[in-house]
């Protein structure tokens, strides 16, 4: 189904569109990045380091964060907003970003969290979140991007 808001934007039964989903994910990443710099929302704020497992700051008291970790969230958010402009780029953001988060999940599983290899830093809660984000972003990109890719293929065949 095509909407008047964007000629190539398809909405699925749940009312989701590829563009809006990528934009929403980008906004969430921006919000998380900003919240990571707010004392109170981030506990042990004074113990935050630029990077590394020594950072004692915990977003919402659960997720270990550092300045670098917060900057990564902000950059992912900016990328999501910028890439949400076209269906192809929105799909790339969701699937590619999801793949990055799955790589981070695997990395977080195999490193010793008490060493310099844990430079972002990660804790167990971060690892679970990275798995969920990776699977969700790839799933949404594949599911919502399916119609956009079908339309592109059909349009090329008509030419």
Language-model segments: which ranges?
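Membrane-interface extramembranous regions
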Residues: 2-159
């Amino acid at each position: 189904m095509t909407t008047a808001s964007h000629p190539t934007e398809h909405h699925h039964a749940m009312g989701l569109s590829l563009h809006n989903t990528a934009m929403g994910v980008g906004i969430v990443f921006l919000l998380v990045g900003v919240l990571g710099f707010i004392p109170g929302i981030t506990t042990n704020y004074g113990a935050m380091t630029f990077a590394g497992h020594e950072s004692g700051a915990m977003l919402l008291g659960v997720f270990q964060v550092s300045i670098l970790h917060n900057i990564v969230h902000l950059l992912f958010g900016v990328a999501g907003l910028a890439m949400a402009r076209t269906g192809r780029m929105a799909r790339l953001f969701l699937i590619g970003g999801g793949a990055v988060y799955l790589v981070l999940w695997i990395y977080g599983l195999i490193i010793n969290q008490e060493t310099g290899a844990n430079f972002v830093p990660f804790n167990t809660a971060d690892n679970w979140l990275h798995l969920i984000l990776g699977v969700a972003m790839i799933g949404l990109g594949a599911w919502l991007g399916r119609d956009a890719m079908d339309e592109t293929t059909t349009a090329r065949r008509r030419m």
